[in-house]
């Protein structure tokens, strides 16, 4: 899972991130990695056609929505959201965080072994399944188990 700071929760900001990823990875790699995107019904995802179509109006992904109040439809994302809330408790302002801070947080979260993955971390599994250029692009680094921090101390300045 990746996370990005947005200027606001608008479709245009999410589209700009999708476009940037597609430009960097190429349309084929983008479509291979993100063949579908499962999301909630937040306003930033309200225009699926804008997100599904990329460079030269080619379809790059398919957007699917979870039903309202059905977090069980994307349990692995919800586990990551729990970890995010451990590091950034509800009410925490993201104004003082940089994208580098968010990427560091996601490196720690993605390095955390999961029982649902047979004891592997999401990042280890991603390294087995995705081209290295994809992992490198997102700037995620594997954190040794004994150095993983999933508390607010991770981002204290």
Each PLM stretch: what is its role?
Residues 3-5, 38, 118:
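Structured core elements
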Residues 49-61:
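Short, surface-exposed basic-aromatic patches at helix termini and helix-loop junctions that form
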Residues 2-28:
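Active-site beta-loop-alpha junctions of metal-dependent nucleic acid enzymes
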Residues 39-41, 51, 63-87, 95-107:
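RNase H-like two-metal-ion nuclease catalytic core shared by retroviral integrases
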Residues 9-14, 20, 82-86, 107, ...:
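Metal-centered catalytic cores of metalloenzymes
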Residues 1-4, 65, 90:
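Short small-residue beta-strand/loop micro-motif enriched in glycine and branched aliphatics
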Residues 90-157:
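C-terminal domain-tail junction helix/linker
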Residues 28-47, 67-69:
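Acidic/histidine-rich, metal-coordinating catalytic segments
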């Amino acid at each position: 899972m990746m996370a990005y700071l947005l200027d606001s929760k608008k479709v245009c900001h999410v589209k700009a991130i999708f476009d940037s990823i597609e430009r960097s990875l190429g349309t084929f790699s983008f479509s291979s990695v993100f063949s579908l995107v499962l999301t909630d019904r937040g306003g930033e995802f309200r225009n699926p056609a804008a997100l599904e179509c990329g460079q030269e109006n080619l379809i790059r992904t398919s957007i699917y929505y979870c039903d309202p109040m059905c977090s069980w439809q994307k349990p692995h994302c919800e586990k990551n959201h729990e970890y995010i809330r451990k590091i950034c408790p509800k009410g925490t302002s993201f104004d003082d965080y940089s994208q580098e801070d968010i990427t560091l947080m996601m490196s720690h979260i993605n390095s955390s072994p999961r029982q649902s993955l047979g004891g592997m971390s999401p990042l280890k599994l991603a390294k087995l399944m995705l081209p290295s250029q994809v992992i490198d692009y997102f700037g995620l680094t594997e954190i040794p188990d004994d150095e993983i921090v999933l508390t607010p101390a991770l981002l204290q300045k």
